[in-house]
């Protein structure tokens, strides 16, 4: 399993990101995702090995406190058809939930950009999650966030070479962020 975290981040204001969900295996957080509708979550395909039964926790800020949150089972797993384990290409997956999310102040879906809509270089963006706070360190039970800036694709390709795909990825830089 790929280990991801929010490095050099700060704790998010509770419930300020109501679209964020915790994807869990045996009630242990393994990945983050976000609601894109009342019954679909978007996440990374590497979060599921093809056999596990995952659940999604919506409405959470602190994973040790179930107040205002709901646990929902996953009805179906829809990884990108070209995703291959151990490769970063096409690492995206939809989860169809067993029941619709009860939308409220703690659980709302996020708006997705329209097709062809680009994010300008140097745009300030945020990343969020419950991952590790430092490399190989402990995971946070509280939602963390960090600000990053969008990087120029040419600069990113120069730095990452064949590991970067302009059509599938975006590069960011900053003092904190999501690290693999």
Task: Please report, for each region that a protein language model flagged, where it lies by residue.
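Short edge-strand/loop segments of extracellular domains
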Residues: 55-65, 111-117, 147-153
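Protease-domain processing segments flanking chymotrypsin-fold serine proteases, especially trypsin-like
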Residues: 1-42, 54-60, 65
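Terminal peptide-recognition signature
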Residues: 21, 33, 39, 43, ...
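Active-site substrate-binding loop(s) of clan PA
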Residues: 78-84, 100-143
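Extracellular trypsin-like serine protease catalytic domains
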Residues: 3-7, 20-26, 123-180
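Acidic glycine-/aspartate-rich tracts in secreted/extracellular proteins
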Residues: 46-50, 60-64, 98-103, 131-134, ...
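Extracellular/luminal ectodomains of metazoan preproproteins built from arrays
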Residues: 1-15, 101-105, 110, 118-123, ...
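Conserved catalytic-core segment of clan PA serine endopeptidases
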Residues: 7, 57-102, 115, 161-162
């Amino acid at each position: 399993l790929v280990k991801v975290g929010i490095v050099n981040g700060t704790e998010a204001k509770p419930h300020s990101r109501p679209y964020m969900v915790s994807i869990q295996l045996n009630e242990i957080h393994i990945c983050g995702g976000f609601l894109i509708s009342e019954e679909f979550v978007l996440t990374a395909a590497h979060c599921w090995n093809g056999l596990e039964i995952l659940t999604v926790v919506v409405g959470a800020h602190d994973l040790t406190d179930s107040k205002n949150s709901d646990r929902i089972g996953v009805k179906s797993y829809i990884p990108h058809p070209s995703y291959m384990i151990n490769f970063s290409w096409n690492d995206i997956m939809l989860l169809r939930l067993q029941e619709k999310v009860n939308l409220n102040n703690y659980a709302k879906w996020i708006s997705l950009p329209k097709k062809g809509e680009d994010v300008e270089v140097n745009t300030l963006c945020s990343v969020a999650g419950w991952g590790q706070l430092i490399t190989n360190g402990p995971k946070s039970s509280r939602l963390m966030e960090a600000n990053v800036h969008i990087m120029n694709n040419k600069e990113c390709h120069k730095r990452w070479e064949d590991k970067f795909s302009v059509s599938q990825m975006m590069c960011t830089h900053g003092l904190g962020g999501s690290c693999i």
